[in-house]
Amino acid sequence: MMYNVFVAKQSIEIGYSNVGYIRKGSISVIQVKEMLVMARFTLPRDLYFGENALETLKTIKGNKAVLCLGGGSMKRFGFVDKVVEYLKEAGIETKLIEGIEPDPSVETVMKGAKVMQEFEPDLIIAMGGGSPIDAAKAMWVFYEHPETTFDDIKDPFTIPPLRNKATFIAIPSTSGTATEVTAFSVITDYSTGIKYPLADFEITPDVAIVDPSLAETMPQTLTAHTGMDALTHAIEAYVAGLHSPFSDPLAIHAIEMIFDNLKASYEGDMQARGNMHIAQCLAGMAFSNALLGIVHSLAHKTGAVFDTGHIHHGCDNAIYILYVIQ
């Protein structure tokens, strides 16, 4: 029933608006359907998946790349060295932007954009969990349009055209956010407690590399949290106001794969871990086009409120989803 109650107010901001308050400029599902007489379904141009998919970087065309990273696990497990070496084989110079925090901040984004403006890359590569990829998407916007502010792009579909300076490659290491295939990025202003839910097909990555070997490094707790994030994406996409014959099969198959593999993945089964990496990507394709619902509204608001004691977004979803369904 709650989904029916909230349909008229479901935000194009994929449920990231404050509960009970739809920010000026957000668009209801009914308005979107009126606008989208001819609907749109958008995915990355290329998606490479499976064992050794990371080696695709050897064939990438470009001159300079920035590699955006999180807390250090990708370097610790040797993936950063691999990426730098593959890019070197392709004749590409690489600069690292490291230390992107969970739920990335406005300050982190602006610092990264400044690095890009000085280095002038024609490739932006983000590797890690959802946070470094989300942050890199926002950096991309401010790299290509330095005059832009967050206020300029906070409303849906207000990001100016990209790809004049760089193309974007996303390489996920966790199996939950699926930001490697979505049109969304969430950036937090901790001074105000505001989360900026950037939503525009412009920030859909050009290339996604879904290599299961990166997900094998996840600890158990992160496996559980990201798995519940993926399950919530799939369920909400399936009942979303903008679901379609294109998004439904992706959502359904993702739900089935997650039910079949999440527990085994949590227990250390690497085949199941690889299946979860694919399932979360399918869920991302679904929700990027169908949008989400009230579970994510609640989860993102919680994340902004409790910034001093970080609650993983997937854990928030796990807490709320049963109550919302009931």
Identify what each model region corresponds to.
Residues 184-290:
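Carboxylate- and glycine-rich phosphate/diphosphate-binding segment that chelates Mg2+/Mn2+
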